[in-house]
Amino acid sequence: MQILFNDQAMQCAAGQTVHELLEQLDQRQAGAALAINQQIVPREQWAQHIVQDGDQILLFQVIAGG
């Protein structure tokens, strides 16, 4: 399957979860947030959320301000 991960085109296996994709890419970061197709996916759902062909995935660091 073809996806965009942080604006980079890449291939991933069919049926792969977000958690598995992040493990494969060594992208396990505390304080990170993830959006798929411009919708935030809560960390609790990463292990169940299946990546779909054409998904646009953004992983970014959450920064607190004040």
UniProtKB/Swiss-Prot annotation:
Species, as recorded: Escherichia coli (strain K12)
Function: Is the sulfur donor in the synthesis of the thiazole phosphate moiety of thiamine phosphate.
Stated name of the protein: Sulfur carrier protein ThiS
TM annotation in the entry: none
Residue(s) carrying Glycyl adenylate: G66
Residues modified as 1-thioglycine: G66
GO molecular function: nucleotide binding; sulfur carrier activity
Position of the signal peptide: none
Similarity-based family: Belongs to the sulfur carrier protein ThiS family.
Pfam families named among the record's database cross-references: ThiS (PF02597)
Pathway assigned to this chain's UniProt record: Cofactor biosynthesis; thiamine diphosphate biosynthesis
NCBIfam families attached to this UniProt entry: thiS
Domain of life: Bacteria
Gene: thiS
Site of covalent link Glycyl cysteine dithioester (Gly-Cys) (interchain with C-184 in ThiF): G66
Annotated disulfide bonds: none
Biological process according to GO: thiamine biosynthetic process; thiamine diphosphate biosynthetic process; thiazole biosynthetic process
UniProt cross-references to InterPro entries, sorted A to Z: Beta-grasp_dom_sf, Mopterin_synth/thiamin_S_b, Thi_S, ThiS/MoaD-like
Post-translational modification: C-terminal thiocarboxylation occurs in 2 steps, it is first acyl-adenylated (-COAMP) by ThiF, then thiocarboxylated (-COSH) by ThiI.
